[in-house]
């Protein structure tokens, strides 16, 4: 990983589903937003879920294997219409775009938003870059809350 390694976080709540794991803090209750992520920033997503208001149901899907990606299985595991893909990769041609394309093909009304960037970054330390790219826990939590509050038109 650039400028670092995967950080530690409590993995005990994640349930193994083969090529991905699922964290459902509410034990399967209604999900407002599912967050798909992988790699080093999973710890930020995990922290962001803890920062979210208790009335927002959030499920996390952590990809363990990126390729081959069975996007339909990932979408099924999300279990809700609003899916936020948080990735430390590129927006165009990334995992989030593949999941969004699969959702569009399915035609089930899933709305996929990708939190990633296109382009080059300035030099900075990792926390500064994460904040700049909205990949820090506070920004991810704010994006989850904003997305949860939005309506979806089908």
Task: Describe every region a protein language model picked out.
Residues 1-154:
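Thiamine diphosphate
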């Amino acid at each position: 990983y650039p400028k670092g390694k995967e950080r530690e976080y409590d993995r005990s709540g994640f349930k193994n589903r083969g090529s991905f794991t699922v964290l459902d803090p509410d034990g399967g209750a209604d999900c407002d937003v599912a967050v798909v992520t992988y790699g080093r920033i999973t710890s930020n997503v995990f922290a962001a879920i803890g920062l979210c208001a208790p009335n927002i149901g959030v499920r996390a899907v952590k990809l363990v294997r990126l390729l081959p990606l069975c996007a339909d299985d990932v979408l099924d595991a999300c279990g809700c219409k609003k899916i936020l893909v948080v990735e430390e990769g590129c927006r165009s041609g990334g995992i989030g775009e593949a999941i969004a394309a699969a959702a569009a093909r399915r035609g089930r009304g899933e709305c996929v938003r990708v939190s990633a960037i296109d382009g080059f970054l300035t030099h900075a330390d990792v926390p500064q870059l994460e904040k700049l790219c909205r990949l820090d826990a506070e920004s991810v939590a704010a994006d989850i809350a904003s997305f949860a509050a939005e309506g979806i038109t089908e």
